[in-house]
Structures are given as structure tokens and as C-alpha cells.
UniProtKB/Swiss-Prot annotation:
The modification N6-acetyllysine is found at K349, K361. This is Tyrosine--tRNA ligase, mitochondrial. GO terms for molecular function: ATP binding; L-tyrosine binding; protein homodimerization activity; tRNA binding; tyrosine-tRNA ligase activity. It comes from Rattus norvegicus (Rat). Pfam families: tRNA-synt_1b.
Length: 471
């Protein structure tokens, strides 16, 4: 007996794949797709022609009459989204802003297999418990980003809905033999083997496991399930997902005779050409506990001049004329990094909210501009995020506590004459102010900030954070 989720499978249509040639599309129908493509956000459309309804016509509300549904998948192979996920999320948000409904699909089941796309070797296997925990974390992250988007980037237009789902909701109800009997028969081995992601792995020394090979079948079924239950006709994914998207298209078309579509976004790579993802070990996370707002902000501040215009178009909702104006100002005074600062501000606000952006700016002022004012209003959390390697101490401020007393209690200098000389020779600063008299008594408001903290620096790189008690 077929599993519950498979009972609605349709018969394979006799007509086969559509073979119509491309035809003219009504003026204005391409608008929804033209704007993101002009920004460089949409890279490839599949299929581009030969379908009953052309992809641009789906998004022509005058013709379609109702909003479309678009989805993108996020496998919980880690416990946080990272900057490599941002482009597909921005793609979903652009559809939502145009009034269409979007689904962020967490792969609580597919992550157990591991997507081989774009990988040179098999992923490290994760336990079911780990995947479930990661899936919950990704769902929270997606909901936070969607909430920030709605709260801080509203433009007055009626938006579509943003829904987060987990494919474990339907795959956990499946039975292996039923699934293979009812779904497996609609996939041809030759077609699956022809995918570039499969070919590259089969030619590699490590080869490819059956679990990885089967991944594209499960992703195709995701697309089918969302098509049947949510009316979803468009899948969004990274450019390395095109093969999986094609499998979904072929599966749905065989079963229903209907056309669905895929849109890819470009992959963002590091300066060495490696994909910016956690697998490469260079991830910038979208979770504050893993990458602070300050670190995210600085990641975009550090982008090169030859990349910043492209990133403004990809990672922000700023109108293209405004981006042109920003770049004109930037070219006149590149040393001010006007474009990078605007890019960093827009992304940090989307990921961490206005509070996170304010925190990133405070940390920037405190670290790079030696701002006492910024230090005074920083929270314990911000100080720990900014000075991750710093030792954190809680000390009682006794009457007459001196500079050398403080340094020794914090274990910041060696005992004896050597530690004394480190102070007299200018190697110690408190709150960005050099101190050279070891016997100087600490002064509240100078050595101890309004927030009850002191930032002690020994040499050029060693920081110590002191929280004073009983002030």
C-alpha cells in the first residue's frame, strides 16, 4: 500500500515533454524578473522556452490573476545560516516584496543524506538528533531574518507571505519500499547519471555514495510536494543546484503535465575562488553567537572596491539609481569607503536588526577610533564579542587600587621588576589611554568607565576586560 503522501501521484501524461518553440511575451510581463536580473541576482532560468506558459508570464498579475509561490531549500548541515545563504534569501524577499508568496524549506530529512552539488567529497555524516537541532536553529534564523525584513525594509506595497517549512514533515511519513515503487519508477538512471554534480563525483577518487546519489530524487519530490500542496511552481537555488532543479521539473512534468520553473542565483566566492560556505572553513555566520554583528559589518567593510558595486546590487534593496549615486561619491573619495559602509550597514541591519547595526558601529568606534564614548556604552556582551580572545575578570575596587595592582590581579603582567617596567616603558594602556605610572590610583570616569568596565591592553594585541564590583 502506498504511503499517505504518495496517494495523489498522477499518471504519466502521454504527450511527453513539451516541444513548443519560444514565443513573444507581452510587454511588461518580464518586469518581476528583469529587475533582479539587472542587479545580477538571477543568473539562469529553467526552462527558458518551450513551455505552455513562459516563466515571466507567471509573474504578470494582470494575466495570472493571483500571486505565485516560490521556494528555496536550506539543508541544516550546520546550526546557523551563513553569508552564502543570503543571496537565495534576498531572492525570496524580492518575490515577496512583489506580492508573491515564498517558502523557505528546511531540509530536516534531506540533510541526513547530504547534497553532493558543488562538493568534491562526501559530507561528514550527521546524527538524526544533530540534524533536528540544526533544523530548529535554521528555522529560528529564517524567521528572524524575515521579521527584520518586514519590520525594517517595508516599502508601502502589499507583500506576499513568508512561510518556513521542514521536509521532515512529509518524509518521516514515507516508507522506503512504497517510495521506491511509486516515485522511483519515474526517474531514469541515465538522466540522473548525466548531472554534472554526479559526473564530477563519479570521476573523483572518493566516488559517490548511494545516499548522495539519491539526494536529487528527494529534492525533486520536495518540489512536487510543494507544487501539489502549496501551488509552488518556482524553485530558487544556487547555480550549483541547477541539476537538482531539472530533476524536479522533469518529475513534476511527467506526473502532471504541468510546467514548473527554476531560477538560480550566483555563488559568492572568496578571493581565492572558494565558495563562501561553512564547508570551506571561511564562513561568516548569520547567528550572533557565531559571528557578531561587528564581525559581519567588518566583513562587508573589507570588501574590495572592484566588488562593492556588485555587492550593493546583490545584497541590498537599494534602488539602482541610489547605488549609482553612492558609487559616484565613493569614486571621488575611495579612502572614506562610503560604498562599503553603506553595504555593511544594509546587510547588518537585515541580519541583526537596527540594534545589531548600532552595536557594530559602537564596536567599530571603540576598536578602530579609540572612542571612549563608545566604550562607555558598550555592554558586557559587546565587549566579549569585540575582544574574543580577551581574558574577562571580575574584581572588587578596593580604596587606593593602583594601575600595577589592577594589572597583577588580572594576571596581565609578570610579577617583579619586569612587570613594573612594562608599565613605565609605555606597554600598558587602560581604555585606550597609555599609563606609565604604576602607582597611579584608578580614577572612576577615567580608568573605570561609566558602565563599570575597564579595557586593559598589554602590548599591541593582548586585551583584558575587567568588570568592577561594588562601585
Amino acid at each position: 500500500m502506498a504511503a499517505p503522501m504518495l496517494r495523489h501521484l498522477c499518471r504519466v501524461p502521454q504527450s511527453g515533454v513539451w516541444t513548443r518553440g519560444p514565443r513573444a511575451v507581452r510587454p511588461g510581463a518580464r518586469g518581476m524578473l528583469v529587475a533582479p536580473r539587472a542587479r545580477g541576482l538571477f543568473k539562469e532560468f529553467f526552462p527558458e522556452s518551450g513551455t505552455k506558459t513562459e516563466l515571466p508570464e507567471l509573474f504578470d498579475r494582470r494575466r495570472a490573476g493571483s500571486p505565485q509561490t516560490v521556494y528555496c531549500g536550506f539543508d541544516p548541515t550546520g546550526d546557523s545560516l551563513h553569508v552564502g545563504h543570503l543571496l537565495t534569501l534576498l531572492g525570496l524577499f524580492h518575490f515577496q516584496r512583489a506580492g508573491h508568496n515564498v517558502i523557505a524549506l528546511v531540509g530536516g530529512s534531506t540533510a541526513l543524506l547530504g547534497d553532493p552539488s558543488g562538493r568534491t567529497k562526501e559530507r561528514e555524516a550527521l546524527s538524526a538528533e544533530c540534524v533536528r537541532a540544526n533544523a530548529r536553529a535554521l528555522q529560528r534564523g529564517l524567521e528572524t531574518l524575515a521579521a527584520n525584513h518586514a519590520r525594517l525594509f517595508a516599502d508601502g506595497r502589499p507583500w506576499g507571505t513568508f512561510t518556513v517549512l521542514d521536509n521532515a514533515a512529509w518524509f518521516q511519513k514515507q516508507h522506503l519500499m512504497d517510495f521506491l515503487a511509486t516515485v522511483g519508477g519515474h526517474f531514469r538512471m541515465g538522466t540522473l547519471l548525466s548531472r554534472l554534480s554526479v559526473q564530477s563525483r563519479l570521476k573523483s577518487p572518493e566516488g559517490m555514495s548511494l545516499a548522495e546519489f539519491f539526494y536529487q530524487v528527494l529534492q525533486a519530490y520536495d518540489f512536487y510536494y510543494l507544487f501539489r500542496h502549496y501551488g509552488c511552481r518556482v524553485q530558487l537555488g544556487g547555480s550549483d543546484q541547477l541539476g537538482n532543479i531539472m530533476s524536479g521539473y522533469e518529475f513534476i512534468h511527467k506526473l502532471t503535465g504541468e510546467d514548473v520553473f527554476g531560477i538560480t542565483v550566483p555563488l559568492i566566492t572568496s578571493t581565492t575562488g572558494a565558495k563562501l560556505g561553512k564547508s570551506a572553513g571561511n564562513a561568516v555566520w548569520l547567528n550572533r553567537e557565531k559571528t557578531s554583528p561587528f564581525e559581519l559589518y567588518q566583513f562587508f567593510i573589507r570588501q574590495q572596491d572592484d566588488s562593492v558595486e556588485r555587492y550593493l546590487k546583490l545584497f541590498t534593496f537599494l534602488p539602482l539609481p541610489e547605488i549609482d549615486h553612492i558609487m559616484q561619491l565613493h569614486v571621488k573619495e575611495p579612502e572614506k569607503r562610503i560604498a562599503q559602509k553603506r553595504l555593511a550597514a544594509e546587510v547588518t541591519k537585515l541580519v541583526h536588526g537596527q540594534e545589531g547595526l548600532d552595536s557594530a558601529k559602537r564596536c567599530t568606534q571603540a576598536l578602530y577610533h579609540s572612542s571612549i564614548e563608545a566604550l562607555e556604552v558598550m555592554s558586557d556582551q559587546e565587549l566579549k564579542e569585540l575582544f574574543k580572545e580577551a581574558s574577562f575578570s571580575e574584581l572588587v575596587l578596593d580604596p587606593g587600587t593602583s594601575v600595577i595592582d589592577t594589572c597583577r590581579k588580572a594576571n596581565a603582567i609578570p610579577d617583579g621588576p619586569r612587570g613594573y617596567r612594562m608599565i613605565t616603558e609605555g606597554g600598558v594602556s587602560i581604555n585606550h589611554r597609555q599609563v606609565t605610572n604604576p602607582e597611579s590610583v584608578l580614577v572612576i570616569g577615567q580608568h573605570i568607565l561609566k558602565n563599570g568596565l575597564s579595557l586593559l591592553k598589554i602590548g599591541k594585541r593582548n586585551f583584558y576586560i575587567i568588570k568592577w564590583l561594588q562601585l
